[in-house]
């Protein structure tokens, strides 16, 4: 007799008085308490309707299939088979769960990467939108391209102003970027074939350098030369002075060719544009001027650029001689088109309180180096205007930057001296410690390095691991104890030094005194 619910032989058998069915006591009592009816017939059923079936108390009844050893073995075999099947099913489920978990983890990782990328793109888009909104003109005006006033200033209608009253720059176009890239490729290829010119002054020659001449080029009431550049093809030296003028000096004849007046404060930087008759000057009056020689020797201001809001410390010309960059204490550097005098891009750093004090193009033109008053040297990708590297280590304001013609070395000057950087590994590999290094300059061949501080030192360049030998120490004869700038002449045949006593001094080999003329021929006031 088996239970009508479980199908097993009941331990405590009971029978329904209504249906006559046999049940296990505990099962039928629970069913009645839950449902109140017979589980088989569905008729109403109570506890009183079930009657226990009594068996002998001494011998318990046994089921037929467990009453013999073969029956027990069969039961055990069935139990074992069920256990194995259940274990196999569990292992299958575990394997499937592991695969699903691995897939879910990969999906989670991919989702995190996508979310991070989307957040970055969102932030960049927001920043770009904010920049565009700042430059959207409040009242659009007609723009006349390349218009200039008779005094050299650009016409007001040339400038589209944003809400913050800053000029909206069009950006560096794809055509210009292609031009810069082509120039870089050509110069890089040319550098691989470059050889040191045989006419380059030897080390023995430099060791015998002495002062050949001295020329007072600027006014006595505001003495001092702040910057200098040399047009090697014509042997003309340009100096920028504290007296707010720039002087063009012909070294072979010892004569002043022209005096450029127009700035209201000291001229902080002066540059020739290739072999052309263009000269750039930057000033503490927050402007940059482009000077042109119409052919009569009298330079006139072609453009006055006032895109900066603080003192302009440096100008540097791109190797194409079509573009240039100015760097200012307002924390920006500007990329200009020389032909139109228009600012194509004005770049600021993401970090706050950055003042640019020096700037120079890499010889290939796609890298720009800038120095700051916060002792940091920053390297920029000109195409994207992105800061790609920075060099820390100086103490005090970075006063000068010079790239070597080999394309690998960068020299920087600051209050703690001069440091040399390897652009391939982005590290400082040598330092020349001296107080208040005002200027540092590689010669055009990259063979020599000049440093202007309390005196003028000339070093022979070498590799990263080799020793850079000191060739010559030239005294600062100004009496001010401050040589402000140093430049090498063509093939390093002479060294030009500017000082705060307004004198331009020429150091060279005795007997080669091309410019040893009377100081009376120069401007005294």
Curated annotation (Swiss-Prot):
InterPro entries to which the protein is assigned, alphabetical: Pre-mRNA_splic_Prp19_cc, Prp19, RING-Ubox_PRP19, Ubox_domain, WD40/YVTN_repeat-like_dom_sf, WD40_repeat_dom_sf, WD40_rpt, Znf_RING/FYVE/PHD
Catalytic reaction equation(s): S-ubiquitinyl-[E2 ubiquitin-conjugating enzyme]-L-cysteine + [acceptor protein]-L-lysine = [E2 ubiquitin-conjugating enzyme]-L-cysteine + N(6)-ubiquitinyl-[acceptor protein]-L-lysine
Cellular localization per UniProt: Nucleus
Enzyme class (EC, first level): transferase
EC number: 2.3.2.27
Domain of life: Eukaryota
Any one biological process term the GO annotation gives: protein K63-linked ubiquitination
Every U-box domain range: 1-70
Keywords associated with the record: DNA damage, DNA repair, Immunity, Innate immunity, mRNA processing, mRNA splicing, Nucleus, Plant defense, Repeat, Spliceosome, Transferase, Ubl conjugation pathway, WD repeat
Ranges occupied by WD repeats: 220-261, 262-301, 307-346, 351-390, 393-431, 433-469, 478-517
Presence of the UniProt keyword DNA damage in the record: yes
Pathway named in the protein's UniProt entry: Protein modification; protein ubiquitination
Molecular function GO terms recorded: ubiquitin protein ligase activity
Chain positions of motif DWD box: 409-424
GO terms for cellular component: Cul4-RING E3 ubiquitin ligase complex; endoplasmic reticulum; nucleus; plant-type cell wall; Prp19 complex; spliceosomal complex
One Pfam assignment: Prp19
Subunit structure: Homotetramer. Component of the multiprotein assembly MOS4-associated complex (MAC) at least composed of MOS4, CDC5, PRL1 and PRP19 which is related to the PRP19C/Prp19 complex/NTC/Nineteen complex identified in other organisms. Associated with the spliceosome.
Family: Belongs to the WD repeat PRP19 family.
Domain notes: The DWD box is required for interaction with DDB1A.
Known function: Probable ubiquitin-protein ligase which is mainly involved pre-mRNA splicing and DNA repair. Component of the MAC complex that probably regulates defense responses through transcriptional control and thereby is essential for plant innate immunity.
Name by which UniProt lists this protein: Pre-mRNA-processing factor 19 homolog 2
Protein source organism: Arabidopsis thaliana (Mouse-ear cress)
Gene coding for it: PRP19B
């Amino acid at each position: 007799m088996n239970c009508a619910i479980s199908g097993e032989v009941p331990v405590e058998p009971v029978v329904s008085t209504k249906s006559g069915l046999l049940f296990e006591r505990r099962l039928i009592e629970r069913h009645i308490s839950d449902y109140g009816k017979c589980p088989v017939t569905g008729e109403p059923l109570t506890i009183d309707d079930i009657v226990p079936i009594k068996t002998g108390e001494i011998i318990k009844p046994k089921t037929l299939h467990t009453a013999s050893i073969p029956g027990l073995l069969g039961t055990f075999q069935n139990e074992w088979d069920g256990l194995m099947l259940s274990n196999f099913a569990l292992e299958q489920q575990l394997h499937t769960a592991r695969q699903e978990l691995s897939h879910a983890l990969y999906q989670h990782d991919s989702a995190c990467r996508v979310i991070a990328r989307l957040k970055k793109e969102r932030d960049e888009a927001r920043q770009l939108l904010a920049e565009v909104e700042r430059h959207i003109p409040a009242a659009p005006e007609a723009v006349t391209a390349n218009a200039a006033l008779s005094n050299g200033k650009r016409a007001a209608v040339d400038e589209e102003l944003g809400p913050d009253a800053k000029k909206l720059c069009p950006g560096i176009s794809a055509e210009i970027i292609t031009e810069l890239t082509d120039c870089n490729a050509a110069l890089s290829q040319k550098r691989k074939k470059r050889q040191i010119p045989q006419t380059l002054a030897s080390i023995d020659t430099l060791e015998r350098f002495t002062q050949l001449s001295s020329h007072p080029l600027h006014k006595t009431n505001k003495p001092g030369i702040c910057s200098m550049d040399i047009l090697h093809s014509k042997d003309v030296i340009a100096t920028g002075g504290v007296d707010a003028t720039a002087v063009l000096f012909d070294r072979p004849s010892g004569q002043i060719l022209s005096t450029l007046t127009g700035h209201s404060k000291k001229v902080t930087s002066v540059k020739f544009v290739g072999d052309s008759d263009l000269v750039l000057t930057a000033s503490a009056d927050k402007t940059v001027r482009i000077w042109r020689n119409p052919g009569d020797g009298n330079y006139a201001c072609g453009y006055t650029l006032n895109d900066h809001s603080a003192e302009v410390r440096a100008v540097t010309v791109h190797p194409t001689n079509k573009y240039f960059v100015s760097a200012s204490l307002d924390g920006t550097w500007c990329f200009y088109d020389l032909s139109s005098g228009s600012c194509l891009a004005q770049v600021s750093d993401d970090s706050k309180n950055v003042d640019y004090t020096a700037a120079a193009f890499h010889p290939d033109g796609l890298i720009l180096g800038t120095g700051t008053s916060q002792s940091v040297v920053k390297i920029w990708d000109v195409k994207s205007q992105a800061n790609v590297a920075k060099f820390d280590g100086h103490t005090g304001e970075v006063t000068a930057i010079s790239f070597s013609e080999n394309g690998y070395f960068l020299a920087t000057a600051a209050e703690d001296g001069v440091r040399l950087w390897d652009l391939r590994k982005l590290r400082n590999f040598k330092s020349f410690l001296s107080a208040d290094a005002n200027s540092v300059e590689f010669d055009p061949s990259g063979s020599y390095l000049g440093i202007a501080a309390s005196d003028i030192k000339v070093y022979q360049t070498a590799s990263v691991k080799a020793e850079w030998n000191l060739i010559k120490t030239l005294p600062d004869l100004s009496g001010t104890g401050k040589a402000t700038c140093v430049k090498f002449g063509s093939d390093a045949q002479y060294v030009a030094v500017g000082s705060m006593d307004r004198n331009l001094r020429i150091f060279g080999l005795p007997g080669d005194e091309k410019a040893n003329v009377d100081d009376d021929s120069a401007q005294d006031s």
